[in-house]
């Protein structure tokens, strides 16, 4: 199999990268009706598999789970999750032949095996679904021509997909139809109904492409969403301890700091996050963000280039073939970092203290979001997609660090995201330690920024620069569709 994106000519590549249309709510008037009365079989019962299935069942759809015989016989976690929630469970041979829609929600590295196993069992003119297009775009999987291939990609972890649905809301979602597999022209109707069944239509749906979803998703998770948070956590903790701060306090400031500051990001973008600072701290955070951009800009664009060319996916798949040797080594090394082993702090840190004592962290968030967004847009990805894969998902990933530090983040995200995270953070961490940390000033991290005389013109220009960055302009528009977003912070 060959990388699908690399088989396209330039015009086709640009067309696929630029597929991005925010769908009107009226387009979902039929909600999930197109799939009602049809048999839907989900392969895989992890976080996305279980929680999407629960939502779809509650929306009136017929859901069952196809698992491997050994998973059933040994009553593995996937079997227990499905049966404990009252779902019908069977083998591929028992359930796939009668399915109208088979939804593959297994990890990326299992997709080719799943396709090889289920495709011969699928009935003529049925449909096959993904929630991430890596297998189609990067692996180049070819699906039988009578089968319709669609994607519904919630822009949140599976647990959040369920929680928002239970609130009567949903999470922003990308949908797509594979242009090589839409024989009856029903792909969009299937994808819309599936998205509605998960609740996504209530938060906003982008009609995208497999290509745009994959390239933007990989870029976001490798850089700002995971890689920057990991690199930032490590260098900020080490700096605080080196400055004589209580290691327990330093650990808590970092662990819960990302979540607290990105909660403001979620509600009002970079503008609101920066507005939580004093004027003196805001000017300093802006200055630090520009320095971080200068140091790390090349790395963001290198990751984007490697994703577009297919170099990243080829490198990762080589590690798959090598038994995930690099992935496991990097995972072990992360577990040994000082931040991961910081003692527990029982004291209280107020919400505002996370902002006042975390100016460098805020600068890292600002620089990282803007760099990731700019790199995606410069590569032909539309602003809406770039926003969802950078700023929008950041509070959700920060929330995982608040639970159990970097370990939890790397457990919750996919192996694909984890591998990309390490590629980025392994390079970014020493750069930040060498070029940014030694030049910090009093008040950049661990204590409030001293008040300085404020020049009105400078403050005006900085505020204008913050508010007029393209990620802020598109973010203000898209957040208008998500006015019911709840707070997710667990900090205390």
From Swiss-Prot:
KARI N-terminal Rossmann domain span: 14-208
Pathway: Amino-acid biosynthesis; L-isoleucine biosynthesis; L-isoleucine from 2-oxobutanoate: step 2/4; Amino-acid biosynthesis; L-valine biosynthesis; L-valine from pyruvate: step 2/4
Annotated Mg(2+) 2 binding sites: 217, 389, 393
Cofactor entry: Mg(2+)
Reaction catalysed by this enzyme: (2R)-2,3-dihydroxy-3-methylbutanoate + NADP(+) = (2S)-2-acetolactate + NADPH + H(+); (2R,3R)-2,3-dihydroxy-3-methylpentanoate + NADP(+) = (S)-2-ethyl-2-hydroxy-3-oxobutanoate + NADPH + H(+)
Domain KARI C-terminal knotted stretches: 209-344, 345-485
InterPro entries tied to this protein: 6-PGluconate_DH-like_C_sf, 6PGD_dom2, KARI, KARI_C, KARI_N, NAD(P)-bd_dom_sf
Keywords from the UniProt entry: Amino-acid biosynthesis, Branched-chain amino acid biosynthesis, Magnesium, Metal-binding, NADP, Oxidoreductase, Repeat
Disulphide bonds in the chain: none
EC number(s) reported in the record: 1.1.1.86
Amino acids binding Mg(2+) 1: 217, 221
Domain of life: Bacteria
Active site residues of this protein: 132
Coiled-coil ranges (or none): none
Amino-acid positions noted as binding substrate in the UniProt annotation, renumbered to this chain: 414
GO biological process: isoleucine biosynthetic process; L-valine biosynthetic process
A Gene Ontology molecular function term of the record: magnesium ion binding
EC category name: oxidoreductase
Family statement drawn from the similarity comment of this UniProt entry: Belongs to the ketol-acid reductoisomerase family.
Functional description taken from the UniProt entry: Involved in the biosynthesis of branched-chain amino acids (BCAA). Catalyzes an alkyl-migration followed by a ketol-acid reduction of (S)-2-acetolactate (S2AL) to yield (R)-2,3-dihydroxy-isovalerate. In the isomerase reaction, S2AL is rearranged via a Mg-dependent methyl migration to produce 3-hydroxy-3-methyl-2-ketobutyrate (HMKB). In the reductase reaction, this 2-ketoacid undergoes a metal-dependent reduction by NADPH to yield (R)-2,3-dihydroxy-isovalerate.
Protein name listed in UniProt: Ketol-acid reductoisomerase (NADP(+))
